[in-house]
Amino acid sequence: MLVLHNSQKLQILYKSLEKSIPESIKVYGAIFNIKDKNPFNMEVLVDAWPDYQIVITRPQKQEMKDDQDHYTNTYHIFTKAPDKLEEVLSYSNVISWEQTLQIQGCQEGLDEAIRKVATSKSVQVDYMKTILFIPELPKKHKTSSNDKMELFEVDDDNKEGNFSNMFLDASHAGLVNEHWAFGKNERSLKYIERCLQDFLGFGVLGPEGQLVSWIVMEQSCELRMGYTVPKYRHQGNMLQIGYHLEKYLSQKEIPFYFHVADNNEKSLQALNNLGFKICPCGWHQWKCTPKKYC
C-alpha cells in the first residue's frame, strides 16, 4: 500500500471518490479533513496510483499509542475490488491487528475479508449495521464568509419560545459522553473532547439555559452522538438542529451524513422529513478485539 502525502494527489483522489458516494462517503469525509489541516493526524493509503482499487484512511502511527483505544484506532475503507481486500488487510503494515480497533465503511462487501483476516489473527469481531443517510440535494455554492456566526444569525430569526441554539466546545464533552450509547468511559471522553476541539458541535439550549439537544461531527465528517434530554423530546429540537446544520454545512461545502439504527423510528422520520436520502449500501462497523483483550 502507498501512503499519499502530496496535496495534489489527495485532491485528485477526493474528487474521484465523489463519484462513488455513498459507498465511499467514509473515506471521502476523512480525506476532506486530512486536506483541511488534518487535525486528527490521519493518513491515506491506496493499493496503487492513480488506478487505485482500495482506499484506507487511518491515524498516523504516533496517534495509536493506546492499544485499547478503538475510538482513536479507527480505519475507514472503500474498495472497488472486494476480492483483493483480504490480502491487503492481512499486511501488518496496513492494519494493526494487535490493537483493539474499529473499521468503518459503507459497503457490506467488506465483511467477508475483515472476518477472514480477523479469524486468522485470533481477533474477535463485533459487527454492527445501521441505516446511512446523506443529503438529497446537491451542495450549494460556498459562501464568502467562514464565520460560524452566520448560523447564529439564521437562528436569531428562527427562535421559538425560550429555546436558543449554540455551538458546543470541549467543556460539553462530559455531558455528550454521559449520554452517548457508544461512550460513557474515559477513552470516549478524550475522543469527544478532541472532536469538539477540532470539529463542529451544535446544540439547543432549553428555557433555563441548559443544553437539551446536541450533535457532534467527527473525523470522517459524520454527524454522531445525537441526543435529546427525555423531558424535551418530541418538541422538534433535533429537527431544528438538522435544519440549520444542513444549511450551514452545505453553504461551506463540508460533506456530512448520519447513521441511524433501524429501530430508531423518531430519528428515521426526522431525517426523512428533512429530505435526507436512505442509502441501500448501509453503514457498517467492525469492532476488532485481540484475544488478549477479550
Curated annotation (Swiss-Prot):
Keywords: Acetylation, Acyltransferase, Endoplasmic reticulum, Lipid metabolism, Transferase. One of its GO terms (biological process) is monounsaturated fatty acid catabolic process. It comes from the Eukaryota. The keyword Acyltransferase applies. Expressed at highest levels in salivary gland and trachea. Also detected in thyroid gland, spinal cord, prostate, lung and fetal brain. InterPro entries: Acyl_CoA_acyltransferase, Glycine_N-acyltransferase, Glycine_N-acyltransferase_C, Glycine_N-acyltransferase_N. It is found in: Endoplasmic reticulum. Disulfide bonds: none annotated. Its EC number is 2.3.1.13. GO terms for cellular component: endoplasmic reticulum; mitochondrion. Gene3D superfamilies: 3.40.630.30. It is an enzyme of class 2 (transferase). Acetylation at Lys-19 drastically decreases the production of N-oleoyl and N-arachidonoyl glycines. The modification N6-acetyllysine is found at K19. One of its GO terms (molecular function) is glycine N-acyltransferase activity. Transmembrane segments: none annotated. It catalyses: an acyl-CoA + glycine = an N-acylglycine + CoA + H(+); (9Z)-hexadecenoyl-CoA + glycine = N-(9Z-hexadecenoyl)-glycine + CoA + H(+); octadecanoyl-CoA + glycine = N-octadecanoylglycine + CoA + H(+); (5Z,8Z,11Z,14Z)-eicosatetraenoyl-CoA + glycine = N-(5Z,8Z,11Z,14Z)-eicosatetraenoyl-glycine + CoA + H(+). Belongs to the glycine N-acyltransferase family. Mitochondrial acyltransferase which transfers the acyl group to the N-terminus of glycine. Conjugates numerous substrates, such as arachidonoyl-CoA and saturated medium and long-chain acyl-CoAs ranging from chain-length C8:0-CoA to C18:0-CoA, to form a variety of N-acylglycines. Shows a preference for monounsaturated fatty acid oleoyl-CoA (C18:1-CoA) as an acyl donor. Does not exhibit any activity toward C22:6-CoA and chenodeoxycholoyl-CoA, nor toward serine or alanine. This is Glycine N-acyltransferase-like protein 2. The gene is GLYATL2.
